[in-house]
A protein has these predicted regions:
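Short glycine-/small-residue motifs
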Residues: 120-123
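Vicinal oxygen chelate
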Residues: 1-6, 28-77, 87-114, 125-128
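Conserved active-site tyrosine of GNAT-family acetyltransferases
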Residues: 17-22, 90, 118
Length: 128
């Protein structure tokens, strides 16, 4: 039985990635370790799910959120309280906005960003 999903990201600029995800996005630090010449930090990211999609549906999601196909095989999605405000905060902290928040057919407000460590992010807020 799986107990935890852990996404491991190799960041060329470790300090910038840590600042962005821990200090700006607000992911709490669970643990940090070092090895000769290397470091790792484990950040809490709330409840985790694994969303598996086929290529046509991934293309559909990109069309809805961005207007064109932009995601690779992996995209990280964070549910946030206010996707519009969080998009602005992350942009000010160095992320590139790929698509501004847009209302989706599944009733959420989704934004797409390129973030440190080469991750493409979706920020989403479920609408009532």
């Amino acid at each position: 039985m799986v107990r935890e999903l852990r996404l491991v990201v190799t960041a060329d600029d470790y300090d910038e990635a840590l600042r962005f995800y821990r200090d700006v996005l607000g992911l709490p630090e669970r643990a940090a370790f070092s090895s000769p010449g290397g470091r790792v930090t484990i950040l809490e990211a709330g409840r985790a799910t694994l969303e598996i999609t086929d290529p046509p549906h991934a293309e559909y999601i990109d069309e809805v959120e961005v207007g064109r196909r932009v995601a690779g095989h992996i995209r990280v999605a964070f549910e946030v309280d206010d996707s519009t405000a969080t998009t602005r905060e992350l942009e000010e902290a160095g992320a590139t906005v790929v698509a501004e928040p847009t209302k989706t057919p599944w009733n959420s407000l989704n934004a797409r960003l390129e973030a440190p460590a080469g991750l493409q992010l979706t920020l989403f807020t479920e609408l009532e």
